[in-house]
Every structure is written in structure tokens, then in C-alpha cells.
Amino acid sequence: MSSPAKIAQTPEFLSKQLLQQQAALKIYDSMTTNKRSFEPLQAGKIGMYVCGMTVYDYCHIGHARVMVAFDVVSRWLRHLGYEVNYVRNITDIDDKIIARANENGEPIGELTHRFIKAMHEDAAALGCENPDAEPRATEHIDEMLDMIGTLEQKQHAYAASNGDVYYAVDTFEGYGKLSKRKLEDLQAGSRVDVDTDKKNPFDFVLWKAAKAGEPQWASSWGGGRPGWHIECSAMSTKCLGNSFDIHGGGHDLQFPHHENEIAQSEAATGCTYAHNWMHVGFINVDGEKMSKSLGNFFTIREVMQKFHPETIRFFILSSHYRSQVNFSDAALKEAHSGLTRIYQALKAADAVLNTSVSAAESIESINAEHAGTHSADFIAAMNDDFNTPQAISVLFSLAKEVNKLARDADDADTQAQLQLQAVQLRALAGILNIGQLNPAEFLQAQIGEVAEDQMSDEQIEALIQERLDSKANKNFARADEIRDLLQNSGIELEDGKLGTTWRRT
């Protein structure tokens, strides 16, 4: 695996630009269905809650998208100068967890511990920072019981004859406001199984009565365990208060989970629950949402056996977080080619400057006048609802400029400009936590991986471009190495006045 190079300190001019751009941030709010200027509830501070994983299996690529998306949101908010409290829960008691533990003949605690550990390993491999808090459902039963008691006292909840406690959706006037569904319309088209213990078919469980052989906790309603929805309401309130700035999760959680969270929390506290709702789009396979229930999912670990973790991160960031994305090997290979372009530019700069661009000592001398518009364009993209594909296009433009400067760096002035732009490229890429590995080691490792399978046209073109750059920088050994690799892979090159052409033999 490629070893990390020394990560650059953010250039002073970029830090100043970022701090000046707090007010320009706009976020699409699923509640209002508008992109609007972001204003934190408390100046300089942001509370963000994201629904995490139910830990009964390995995380799949859909989970990876949520992890990476909100990792970048958190990073960007911090770069803007905010103090962020990022909370992501863990559901460690649930019907699926109980069923899997029984299927395996494994204690529930051992099962959840194993998959929490695996989740953390996967997130770290994808370059995600740990949340500031990661509350587990089983550690906050008291808070859940308190909230259920408050809801019952305010006549939003009732105990049924079977020992369950339900939320009465009829008692909350705003039910459906997030998903834009009216309760009467839901009832009119309902195919919900009739449950004689419920007053309304859409009432949902807050507390499940104990069943033989299942974990249970004592309560005033008898032994049992919490429902899924109350977990997030109680834990978010515990960690962030009655109201907080951002609530996030996958688009599939908008209804009923997030709708039910709103009903519970706002009925219990009388406060607006979350002031901005962010939802990450689906990852599709052959036009269908990737999910465990459909059996069409790929675990992060399976995909990492074929692709570098940073390639997966780049694939996720190459699409806007709200869009739907189609998952395929071809899409991952295209992401690999794009990431390679950035590393090739950094490697070309290293070869000319004979030092890692991340450790440049003249960072403090860089100023906005010499840096061009790249940083401003990058900031504008990220402030536009975290538009990472547009931000990546800025990185591509900057990489192209770095390559050109590396080819023409015959004098001190050009070399100084090359160092400036290369440092800027790594610093901007670092905000997304890409491009921070040692370029030469990353590219060498990728050549070995590419050689194991037939190369795509994009991979061939990327290697040809690296060969041309290597020749221009008088790194003939590297150019010959790439030529030999392509020949051994059945790719014949022909150099001419108009450039290099190729064909498969």
C-alpha cells in the first residue's frame, strides 16, 4: 500500500479565503426543498446528527457513500472555521441483529462488537475521520424511556394490551411534513397489515414488549426494548439538545424513519427538531437501489479487493451527494483514471522540484494574486451544497496546469510557479482527503493492479499521458517502464508527429 507523504499545511491565503466564505455556504434542505443560505443556531458552532449503521453485517457501498458524504461535509464546515459536533449513532439492538445472532448461534454483544470494529476499519480505509460522538442505542435506554414517558404524558403515546407502547400519529399535526405525505392520503392507500393493538395502522412502536430469549430492559410498561425510531430521537437530543443544525442520512430514511423522529422529538420538546435536513442519494445496481434486502449489494471489503480505497472515495465524490449513482466496475475504473490524473501531476512536480510538494517550505509566500482563480472556484463549488464533482473539476484544471508547468520548468520563475500550483493542488485535494499519498508509490501500486486485468481505454490513455509527461521531464526510465507494461498487456504504441496512437494487438 502507498505510504502517506507529509500532508501540507493549508496555505495562509487559502485559510483566509475559507474564513471569509462562511456566509456564502448554501445547503439544500429536504424539508423546504430549497437550497438556502446556512445560518447556524449558535454563531461559530454546528451540531450535526447522522443516522448510522445497524451492525449485523459488513457495510456495503451504499453505507460507504453516506460515510464519505458526511465526512466531507464535516471537513468542509471545519475548514470554514466552524466548531463542529458531528454525531453518528450505532444501532446495536434491533430485530435484524437478534435474528442474525440466533442464526449464527452467537451472543448479540459479540456480533455487534465484531461488526462495529469492521465498520470502523472500513471507514478508516475510506479516509473518513471518526465522528465526534458515536452513541450506541444500548447505552442510552434511560433517555429513550424518559422520552417515551414524556410522550405518554402529553398524550402522544399509548400502551397497548400486548405490552407494546405506540406513538399516536393522529396527535401530531405536522406528520408527513418532511416527506410531503399527508396522513389521510397514506391511510386512503394503505396496505398496512391490520394490527388490532394499534389505534391507527400508521402508529409506530416506541417500546416493544419482551419476548422469550431476547434482550430486555425494565420499564414502567414492563420488560422490553426500544423501537428503532425512538433511538435516534433520544440520542440526538442527548448529544445535541432539543434543536440542532443538520440532520443527515440516506434518502431511504426520509420516510418513515426521519418523519417519525420529527413527530417524536417535536411532540416531546415543543422545539423544531433539526433546522436542515440532508439526504444522500441511492447507489443503484442495474437500475435498482443497492440494499441488503434486495441482495444486490457489494460490501466495502469486497470492492476494496479490486480497487484502492481512495479510488472508491473518489468514485463517491465524483457525483453530487444528492444524486443517484450507478455502481459498476466501469464506473470504478473511470474514477481510478481520474484520481490517477491528480497523482500524475503531483509526481511530475516532484520529479522537477526534487522534493515532495507537500513539504514545500515556501508555502507562506504563496498569495492569492499568484495562485489564480482555482481556490476561489473550489470554494464556490463546495459552498454550493457541497458540490464535490465541480470541486474535482477544479482539481483537474489545476492538475493540467501543473503538468504544463512541469514540462516547461527550465527556469527559476517557472519552477517557483510550479511549486506554488502543486502545493495548491495538494492542499485543495486534501480538503476532500484525496491526493495525500506518496504519488510515486500510489502510481506504482496501481500499475501492478491494472496489469492483473484488461485495461480500459481510460486507463490506457492515462498511462500514455504519464509516459509523455515522463519523457518531457526526462524521466526516460519511467517512460520505458510504462511502454513495456502496455506492450505486455497487448497494447501497441506508435509515436508520431501528431502524438501517440495505440491499438490492442
Curated annotation (Swiss-Prot):
Its EC number is 6.1.1.16. It comes from the Bacteria. ATP binds at residue 292. Zn(2+) binds at residues 51, 232, 257, 261. Its main location: cytoplasm. It catalyses: tRNA(Cys) + L-cysteine + ATP = L-cysteinyl-tRNA(Cys) + AMP + diphosphate. Keywords: Aminoacyl-tRNA synthetase, ATP-binding, Cytoplasm, Ligase, Metal-binding, Nucleotide-binding, Protein biosynthesis, Zinc. Its cofactor is Zn(2+). PANTHER family: CYSTEINE--TRNA LIGASE, CYTOPLASMIC, CYSTEINYL-TRNA SYNTHETASE. This is Cysteine--tRNA ligase. It comes from Psychrobacter sp. (strain PRwf-1). The lineage of its organism: Bacteria, Pseudomonadati, Pseudomonadota, Gammaproteobacteria, Moraxellales.
